Amino acid sequence: MRSEVVNMLEYLYPLRTYLIVSGVEKPNVMTADWVVPLSFSPQLLGVAIGHSRYTHSLIKECGEFVVAVPTIELLKDVWKAGTLSGAKENKMEKLSLTLVESKKVKVPSIKECQANLECRVVKEVETGDHTLFVGEILHVTHGDAFKDGKPDINYKFVMHASFGKNFTTNSSERFEP
């Protein structure tokens, strides 16, 4: 077995890819692979966002965010949300996603996603060049991919295969936007 120092985070992939919605006046959507469950009671999750990201400033400003769960049918929008900058242009004009009113937070949810987890920030942890935003899940809406609150693995959830343009799903297929 080789031992060398490289980008060690590559060894954690593939990871599920989510859409993070932030902002109220001018909502923004970004992709994030670094989303993690943190607690059952209270229900908490964490999302690590780089300090330089526009989404970082929006979450700091409003204290809320939505974690949306896309399937592979949304891959082109997932790719655009992760490669365009909301600070430089209105991403929503480039995406074919529909923002809908959330139930418990001011930040909108995404109609086309199979689940939307509405979160209020309860803690921020500085972790080098990222902030781990700890969000209490206040409400969840879901589609058919989560009947009875459990994921249906017949739905192809987006997974980032590695840094870059390779994606996969919970199947063995590989996809590119």
From Swiss-Prot:
InterPro entries in UniProt: Flavin_Rdtase-like_dom, Flavoredoxin, Split_barrel_FMN-bd
Cofactor: FMN
Protein name stated in the entry: Uncharacterized protein AF_1786
Keyword field: Flavoprotein, FMN
SUPFAM superfamilies: FMN-binding split barrel
Entries under SMART domains matching the protein: Flavin_Reduct
Pfam families linked: Flavin_Reduct
UniProt family annotation: Belongs to the flavoredoxin family.
Record-level Gene Ontology MF annotations: FMN binding
